[in-house]
Amino acid sequence: GGPVEQVTTGERRLSSFSFSADGTVMAFTATDPVTPTELYVAMGDGATEQKATGFNDDWLGLVTLQPAERLTWTVEDGTEIEGWVIKPVGYGEGDSYPLILKIHGGPHSAYGNTFFPTFHVLSSAGFFVLYTNPRGSSGYGHDFMYATRGQWGILDKEDYLTGVDSALARYPAADSTRLGVSGGSYGGFMTNWLTATTDRFQAAVTSRSITNWESWYGTSDAQGLTEYEFMGTPWEQRDLYRRLSPISYVENVTAPTLIIHSEEDYRTPLG
């Protein structure tokens, strides 16, 4: 019944907590942008924390991982957006590197202080990696999470493009003429939306994506999502469903795009 007090420390993601019967010892998993998930044990007050597993120690001794650097920017209405940049392995001030924007799904989810293997694969291949939590993401309050209701692809597009500009300004070695974009599920929708409504990106990878919200509604298992977010069904909000569908602007796409899908993905199915 007392006040809540944080007893763990560090910029990382903790989960899967388990406590001893008397509450004096706890175990949990933890990860951060350069540390894959491991198991930790500590006293109930957070003291004497020790890493109990070393599943990834050998692998970490073989690879070079760049840290994630936090970046924030302000969009037109004054909202602050949070993101992170991972530099390319072997980064040098005088060199030039492509930049990839990675987009999370949801849209009501979020990136954070977590290990993302894909991002490090891209970094090791010589890419800057930008990932961010635009409006619509979770973790920043109700108004932020539902700011994009009825405007999917509109407000978050501004957040992403402003973030790309901010990253290019902060990292002169990032080449504005070699930009890529990639995401899955809602991130795939957003990838499609960006390549259909802007010419900023020279290449794209869209995974488990949505191009047509009307056909998605007829095949997905999550119709309630757009019934709320688009304020009705496709036959009640036909213009909105079509206006927010990337397929409506497909003739504008010029970026070479790799399309990846999953036959048994019932949330974002084929078709």
Model-predicted segments: where are they?
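Structural cue for short, hydrophobic secondary-structure segments
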Residues: 102-105, 121, 131
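Peripheral, non-catalytic segments that deliver or gate enzyme domains
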Residues: 1-82, 86-95, 107-125, 166-169
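Glycine-rich His-Gly loop
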Residues: 31, 102-106, 185, 262
